[in-house]
């Protein structure tokens, strides 16, 4: 049985009295963004909109993006990455649970020194997937586009991790799972959270 979005008692910055607002609105006001589930167009549009809107209001207050996602559309992941990288607001990324596929790309896209993984989180990189049907010329064109995107994603991973491009390309050939510590060694994250 769905429970809906919980409400919390919260005073907005310009308000004297607190009121009940939905949890996500409260988190956004504190610059906390949670990415969970598939990276589909609807979720990505909301995340990009929040990043843009809040960074235009105050670009000095840091974002904290918590990620627990199996990934999704490569273009959606690139859209979030671009929104994170092309504004002046510092961005912390935190892996909670699973950060796979384009979710690991977003995780790596946080500011260097501000990328964290919880100790039991899992991180996975792999090559972008594509599929097409239709006339052979359309299939060839789509395959060329998938190869172009794969190169783009690999270049960005190499840039963000410090790994050689050929290592990234080889590791993306299949699902490459990593523990939090392995992801730190690889350069996807900078820190692994310590347990209490």
From Swiss-Prot:
GO terms for cellular component: chloroplast stroma; endopeptidase Clp complex. It is found in: Plastid, Chloroplast stroma. Its EC number is 3.4.21.92. CDD domains: S14_ClpP_2. Keywords: Chloroplast, Hydrolase, Plastid, Protease, Serine protease. The active site is at 101 (nucleophile), 126. The keyword Chloroplast applies. One of its GO terms (biological process) is protein quality control for misfolded or incompletely synthesized proteins. Component of the chloroplastic Clp protease core complex. Cleaves peptides in various proteins in a process that requires ATP hydrolysis. Has a chymotrypsin-like activity. Plays a major role in the degradation of misfolded proteins. Belongs to the peptidase S14 family. This is ATP-dependent Clp protease proteolytic subunit. It comes from Pleurastrum terricola. The lineage of its organism: Eukaryota, Viridiplantae, Chlorophyta, core chlorophytes, Chlorophyceae.
């Amino acid at each position: 049985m769905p429970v809906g979005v919980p409400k919390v008692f919260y005073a907005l910055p310009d308000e004297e009295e607190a009121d009940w607002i939905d949890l996500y609105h409260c988190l956004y006001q504190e610059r906390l963004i949670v990415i969970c589930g598939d990276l589909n167009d609807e979720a990505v549009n909301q995340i990009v909109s929040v990043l843009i809107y809040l960074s235009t209001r105050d670009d000095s207050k840091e974002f904290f993006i918590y990620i627990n996602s199996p990934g999704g559309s490569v273009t959606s992941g690139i859209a979030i990455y671009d929104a994170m990288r092309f504004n002046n607001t510092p961005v912390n990324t935190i892996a909670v649970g699973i950060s796979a596929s384009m979710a690991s790309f977003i995780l790596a896209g946080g500011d260097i020194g501000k990328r964290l993984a919880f100790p039991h989180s899992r991180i996975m990189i792999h090559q972008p997937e594509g599929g097409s049907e239709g006339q052979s010329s359309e299939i060839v064109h789509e395959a060329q586009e998938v190869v172009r995107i794969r190169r783009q994603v690999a270049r960005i991973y190499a840039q963000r991790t410090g790994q050689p491009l050929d290592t990234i390309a080889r590791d993306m050939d299949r699902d490459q799972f990593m523990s939090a510590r392995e992801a730190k060694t690889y350069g996807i994250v900078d820190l692994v959270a310590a347990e209490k």
